[in-house]
């Protein structure tokens, strides 16, 4: 416990909160170019081949981003937009690719939650 005099001399340090999406630098989304598109396996109780992409952002930072939805058209040099949002069973994946923008197509034959996957309204 510090004395009053010690607190006057040196004030208390505020506890700094760690940012969940540092690469976005306080922007809602960021544009980037895919440098590698691949699949990876999730953490222990789960089993799958999750589609992810390594993306170099316009601010020069390179991050791993998840490709949501079934099927995608991404390859190396595709221009994408990423948003925040981690994938719980993929360590190190803290970003999602936005479907239906730039070079990313929307999910085909999607009927529910269409706006989240960039799918047009079915006729």
Curated annotation (Swiss-Prot):
Q: Which SUPFAM superfamilies match?
A: Nucleic acid-binding proteins (SSF50249)
- Keywords per UniProt: Methylation, Ribonucleoprotein, Ribosomal protein, RNA-binding, rRNA-binding, tRNA-binding
PANTHER family noted in UniProt: 30S RIBOSOMAL PROTEIN S12 FAMILY MEMBER (PTHR11652)
| Gene3D superfamilies registered for this protein in UniProt | Nucleic acid-binding proteins
Cellular component annotations (GO), alphabetically ordered: small ribosomal subunit
What is any one GO biological process for this UniProt entry? translation
Q: Which PROSITE patterns match?
A: RIBOSOMAL_S12
One MF annotation (Gene Ontology) recorded for this entry: tRNA binding
Specify the protein name: Small ribosomal subunit protein uS12
- What species is given as this protein's source? Desulfovibrio desulfuricans (strain ATCC 27774 / DSM 6949 / MB)
Family matches, as Pfam families? Ribosom_S12_S23
Q: Which CDD domains match?
A: Ribosomal_S12
Q: Where are the transmembrane segments?
A: none
């Amino acid at each position: 416990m510090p004395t009053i005099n010690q607190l006057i001399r040196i004030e208390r340090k505020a506890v700094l909160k760690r940012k969940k999406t540092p690469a976005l630098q306080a922007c809602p989304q960021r544009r980037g170019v895919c440098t590698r598109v691949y699949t990876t396996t999730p953490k222990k109780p789960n089993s799958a081949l999750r589609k992810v992409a390594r993306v170099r952002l316009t601010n020069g930072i390179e991050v791993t981003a998840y490709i949501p939805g079934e099927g995608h058209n991404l390859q190396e040099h595709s221009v994408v937009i990423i948003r925040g949002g981690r994938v719980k069973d993929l360590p190190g994946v803290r970003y999602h690719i936005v479907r239906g923008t730039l070079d990313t197509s929307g999910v085909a034959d999607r009927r529910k939650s269409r706006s989240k996957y960039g799918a047009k309204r079915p006729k």
